[in-house]
């Protein structure tokens, strides 16, 4: 996932030359953070906890300072081999980790991630792992990316702050760098698609921009050689009926956005959750399953309702007066674990408790205690509609064609990065009940913008929200409003992308889904 914990994190105690456990010197890169004082959460410990906050400093290159001891924490988990714990983590440490994401407004960035389905032009069948490996190697060699390996298998690429990774069924994911403007975001997407196509087309491979695999069943999807996915694959059927579909047959586009303080995080979290069903409707793009209409406009969104309700959903507690970083930590601690990573291997801990882990009582590795990398890994196994890490992830949209990959971050940046639009949304949604939010979340995958809401349709609310997003982008002053054109047309007509595909299926396509591979080809 795109990591937006770049230089500028505001939870900083020291900034000095430090002698690390390895014996090497490391100089922290965030001198300016000393000036930020308690912009982020100087009052958290007094408001949310009886214990004083432990001093943690976690910078971009992964140096941790805690209780006067030093340890190296590698920047890209899982890399537990680099961690030497001074003493067991406390709950306060976990809270401080989330709070370390706070940034002053001038350091806010946009991190966009998208997934896509690779397929063979001749057969429309999903890419096999061997083809994916050839593609990754080709991109690495031609465009100077660094290879990411798991054992002998190539499983991804890195270049600067961008990374390419593989979802369980070979879905090809770009996790973009933290960027300042939507122009940069769209340029990054275009550059990535150019590079992928340059290699893939020579192999007879294309990529499809949709939210759910339209033609092939689970048995037809290849399994990627990644240890964490094997653990998830074994666990999913125990906790929901659609978890394997989520893993192997869905694609999304999401944006990761920053916050300045705990209070700012809360406001953005609430606005994001309230409006997430609107984003789901605007980007609904997964109406086909195994060659036929599936009864949904966003099958991808529906799948999350029966994947694992311990780790998905609309998080009603975010709207409680007591909500803050500490309450999210309490929630995350109660989400069952999937795995820990030790000695270059994933250890199955599915269903076990992170609280037990913190007490050294995790049965597969008794006496072992978690590191911040373990905590970061655990946070990536939680899948609500909006997810908190050291930034907020908006997770409600289906994958789609490249213009929509630019429109999704534009929608959320216009709302969440503009104070006037954000406050207007909070005022607009302040009297929405938890039951209404849940109703929208459950009905939108089927009825989209035609979902009844109060005395009208969701379309009418969406029109107001898209207008607020546009006004927010205008106030940013970067001439970014054009990126909203895709969703402006959707709210004008009330017709979602999925409904357009269904119209083609029943008409021009002669009840075949095969043409969708051309219609939504990148």
From Swiss-Prot:
Pfam families: GCS2 (PF04107). Residues 1-45 form a transit peptide. It catalyses: L-cysteine + L-glutamate + ATP = gamma-L-glutamyl-L-cysteine + ADP + phosphate + H(+). GO terms for cellular component: chloroplast. Its main location: plastid. SUPFAM superfamilies: Glutamine synthetase/guanido kinase. One of its GO terms (biological process) is glutathione biosynthetic process. This is Glutamate--cysteine ligase, chloroplastic. It is found in: Plastid, Chloroplast.
